[in-house]
């Protein structure tokens, strides 16, 4: 997705602007929602060290936040509260605003402070799609304003499993984060029949840790940038299915409970992780549905042996794959 910005400035919204910062909460991560159980994270959480405030920080504030694009302030919470600022394509959340609606701001100009206890600034980005609607997009996608962003670690496809379809309600785990509990009966991939829910566990480890080296329990893999599947009949070599499961350059319309598969856990926020890392797992677990509802109808295929090849990419272009051979017996 290409986007025309108001200027050519590139960098990060916290100092130093020209150096990479660790990101712990990634775009499209699951997040709690009172009405539907869970929705998608609409930005990226750029980490700051609350235990090392910048010089001159006011009480209960830790780091200065800067605009990464020139523009007029479209929204700003009143000073003194944990709120947000909207300028140009970008939203800066969990900040104590230091600008007012209507003001003109240059890229690199301070717009607020991060708030103690949050350990990050949430950076959201919106762009107008082909349909003219403004939607959230991934600020770490190739060609965006956040630069430099380097990730030399390959994403991982850890496991492929087969289940009877199930759509459990989202629950919670320690730290008040969401989880989609295990549900459905696991199937023997040597005897698949009928409707099958194909589930893949995959994630994107980060090669850049920054100050997470000092607090290693805060390091967590990201949501992969892209995932695709190819299904091949092993007897004939025919490709019977090939499709992109998702691409996380923009906000998804698919409900979170169909994008994610049972077994998914949200990444624990930094403040919760610091409290519970000795007794609970901080990183999230990503399980994805390869065929969202109505799932994979094996009755449409001839009986026989097939190979599912799942390929995953990260935002830096690294890729990995995993094969799973199955037998359909309807």
Language model features: what each stretch is:
Residues 3-7, 21-67, 90, 168-187, ...:
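Short glycine/threonine/proline-enriched tight-turn/helix- or strand-capping micro-motif at secondary-structure
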Residues 23, 65-67, 71-73, 102-114:
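A structural signal for short beta-strand/turn segments enriched in small hydrophobics and glycine
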Residues 25, 48, 75, 94-97, ...:
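A residue-level detector for short acidic-glycine micro-motifs
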Residues 58-98, 119-125:
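Zn2+-dependent peptidoglycan hydrolase active-site motif and core
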Residues 84-87, 105-123, 144-148:
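Short hydrophobic beta/alpha edge segments that flank linear recognition/processing sites
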Residues 127-154:
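Short peripheral tails and domain-boundary helices/loops at the edges of structured domains
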Residues 148-172, 176:
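Proline-centered linker/hinge motifs at extracellular inter-domain junctions
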Residues 168-330:
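Long, low-complexity serine/threonine/glycine- and acidic-rich segments characteristic of extracellular
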């Amino acid at each position: 997705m290409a986007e025309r910005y108001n200027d050519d400035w590139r960098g990060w919204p916290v100092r130093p602007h020209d150096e990479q910062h660790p990101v712990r909460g990634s775009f499209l991560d699951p997040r709690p929602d009172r009405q539907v159980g869970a929705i998608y994270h609409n930005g990226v959480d750029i980490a700051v060290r609350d235990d090392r405030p910048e010089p001159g920080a006011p009480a209960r504030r830790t780091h200065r936040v800067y605009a990464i694009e020139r523009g007029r302030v479209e929204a700003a919470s009143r000073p003194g509260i944990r709120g947000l600022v909207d300028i140009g394509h970008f939203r800066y959340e969990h900040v104590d605003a230091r600008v007012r609606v209507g003001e003109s701001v240059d890229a690199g100009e301070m717009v607020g402070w991060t708030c103690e206890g949050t350990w990050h600034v949430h950076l959201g980005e919106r762009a107008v799609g082909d349909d003219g609607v403004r939607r959230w997009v991934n600020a770490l996608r190739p060609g965006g304003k956040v630069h430099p962003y380097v990730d030399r670690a390959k994403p991982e496809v850890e496991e492929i499993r087969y289940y009877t379809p199930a759509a459990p309600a989202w629950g919670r785990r320690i730290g008040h984060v969401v989880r989609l509990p295990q549900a459905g009966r696991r199937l023997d991939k040597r005897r698949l029949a009928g409707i099958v829910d194909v589930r893949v566990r995959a994630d994107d480890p980060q090669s850049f840790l920054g100050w997470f080296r000092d607090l290693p329990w805060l390091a967590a893999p990201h949501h992969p940038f892209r995932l695709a599947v190819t299904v091949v009949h092993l007897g004939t070599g025919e490709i019977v299915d090939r499709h992109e499961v998702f691409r996380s350059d923009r906000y998804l319309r698919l409900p979170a409970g169909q994008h994610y598969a049972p077994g998914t856990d949200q990444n624990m926020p930094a403040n919760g992780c610091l409290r519970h890392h000795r007794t609970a797992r901080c990183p999230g677990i990503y399980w994805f549905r390869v065929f969202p509802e109505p799932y994979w109808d094996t009755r449409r295929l001839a009986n026989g042996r097939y190979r599912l090849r799942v390929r995953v990419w990260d935002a830096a272009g690294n890729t990995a794959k995993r094969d799973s051979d199955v037998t359909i017996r309807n």
